[in-house]
Amino acid sequence: SVRVQFVMPNTPAMVYEGVMLFEAQNSLEEEERIQIKELFAAVGIVEELPSNLMGIGGAVTGCGPAFVDLFIEGYADAAVKYGVPRQTAYRLISQMILGSAKLQLETGEHPGVLKDNVCSPAGTTICGVASLEESGLRSACIKSIDAIMNK
């Protein structure tokens, strides 16, 4: 009579902003499923996935915080290079990421639309976007997940 539910949290759960992947296939009764989801919802969102997607879900949400931290560190290094104190750079960049993510979540807009809203013709932002594209940012994101999935 042991019941099993696989739940995969990520580190942002420590500040109540986590992602809890909840495997759809389980041995729980419906009432137990609801109670466990409510329990984990206290530390973030609960997303139910079929068993065959738990691996990729974990790769994206479980490993992703390290990649975001690397992104923060890289942009902070650039800010420091141009004179911004490191702690200020971390705070500014982290808040920018938090705000951008919240904007996408609350509006439901496609990330490309939100990006385009910031890019003026011949402006600084589109020049930075072009540089990131030339450097293979999207490809690097995909390859990082490929490396995890092929481990």
Task: Map each language-model feature to its residues.
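Rossmann-fold dehydrogenase core element
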Residues: 1-11
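Short beta-strand segments
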Residues: 6-8, 23, 119
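Residues at secondary-structure transition points
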Residues: 2, 27, 62, 66, ...
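NAD(P)-dependent Rossmann-like dehydrogenase/reductase catalytic/cofactor-binding core
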Residues: 94-151
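Internal alpha-helical scaffold of NAD(P)-dependent oxidoreductase catalytic cores
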Residues: 2-3, 19-57, 68-106, 149
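Short pre-catalytic strand/loop immediately N-terminal to key active-site residues, enriched for Gly-Thr
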Residues: 4, 54-59, 111-116
